[in-house]
Every structure is written in structure tokens, then in C-alpha cells.
């Protein structure tokens, strides 16, 4: 039972928070928010949560009330909320009623390309535009919208190349 395991993890986090010295609590997404909240209550330390996606993103609007409640409780107790995009930040502010002053967009980063990769000759796309979808190919990222948009655009013009790169369960 997933919710039982979330609760068990929260209990363990409380025990660890009583025994260890630390400065801040960092929790990633709803599965760890109860543990983060428990650790904050036990230790009095600030809680910073990282929102990779909300249930609004994962469920396409068919939000699970239990998951929403866990997410909202974590956000309500958080001193700082880091979101992976501005879209997620707006969802947190608008759908979870969070104070914008504590919600920040912290984009996932990539390593700069090595010189060897930078030196590879690039194809000449001066006569066409290139539109990319780079990321996990999963339902929550919406790759089907990219494909649908490509079909609509290609009905009107032909000088556009659509490129998808990534991996996932779709």
C-alpha cells in the first residue's frame, strides 16, 4: 500500500530528524512531502520542497484528492518551493494557493557540450526551421501535443522539421 509506505517513511524521517544535526530539509515531490513536514515539525528546521510535477500535470486535470491534499499540505508547510518550470510555478501559486514570494522556478540544467561535440559540422537549416521536443517522453510531458501541433503546422507549411529526443514510457 503506497500511502502506508509514505506514512512509514514519514515516521522514519521524524526519528532521523531527532537524532541528526542538519540545517535544512529538502523534499522532492509528493511522496516525500509528509516526511519533510514531519522532520520540520520535530526539528524546527526550514523545509524546502522541490516540485517536479503536480497532480494537475500528471493527471491532466483529473486530480486525485488524496494526492492533492498531500501536495498542498507539503506546500503549506514549506518555507521555500522550487519548481522545475515557470508553468509549474504558476500551477503551484494558482491551484495550491501558495504565496508567490516563496515559490521559485529553478530550471533543470544541462552540462555544456564538450569542444569535440561543438566542432561537429552542423547541417544547413537556413531554408527550414527546426522545432524540438527534448525531454522525457511520458504522459505528463505531453509529447502527443507536440505531434498534434506538428501535424497542424505541416498542413500550412512544409519548411519546418520537427525533432523529438528523449526516453520514457510512451
What does each of the following model-derived ranges do?
Residues 2-5, 15-32:
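Short N-terminal targeting/anchoring amphipathic segment
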Residues 5-12, 45-48, 56-73, 112, ...:
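Nucleotide-sugar donor phosphate/pyrophosphate-binding loop at the beta->alpha transition
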Residues 14-19, 41, 64-81:
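Membrane-proximal helix-turn-helix segments that form the acceptor-binding/catalytic region
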Residues 24-26, 33, 37-57:
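Active-site proximal beta-strand in glycosyltransferases
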Residues 25-26, 76-86:
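A short beta-strand/loop micro-motif in the catalytic core of glycosyltransferases
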Residues 87, 109:
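Carbohydrate-associated surface elements
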Residues 123-151, 163:
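Conserved donor-binding/catalytic core segment of Leloir-type glycosyltransferases
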Residues 156-157, 161-170:
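Short, structured helix-loop element that forms part of the nucleotide-activated donor/catalytic region
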